[in-house]
């Protein structure tokens, strides 16, 4: 919800600064963006990296209009673009298309793949993960929709942790049972069971904090 997202951002941003250096829009689906039009009024981005069809949803159109009215620079995402975050730390666009983009986050030895905007041919263009290599964290695409999460991508990426972002009682019945079956043997965390999932890394170690099961965390050494 808008209030939950606003609260979580407030906890993570410095009290004296409510601006974002960059806002990355990796999908223009309505369910992905519905909270953002009100959020960006409170946390104003200095720059926007935009993936996907601007006319793809009502919220996407609202955001496009707001950025234009506020003279906020918007860059269209393309495969290979990179936001440098520091020494050996970056966010890179692995693929981009009408539905959005696939993001790779790297910080030292830590790597996370976020296939947020997967469309037709996206996974094929990435050789089902072979062109990316091993990652530590993988976000399931499309809340665990089977065609967006073939078993090959799990085998090729070999993630230490798989994160499933899905609402409790998803109206489409997601995640697909076939996807969950394919993940047997992998470490999986689900937002419908654990709430907000936070992954923290210094580039050598990774800590995972989960919200709904008390102050629990897992520490993982990256190799």
Predicted segments with their positions:
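Non-globular, low-confidence helical/coil segments that flank catalytic cores
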Residues: 1-223
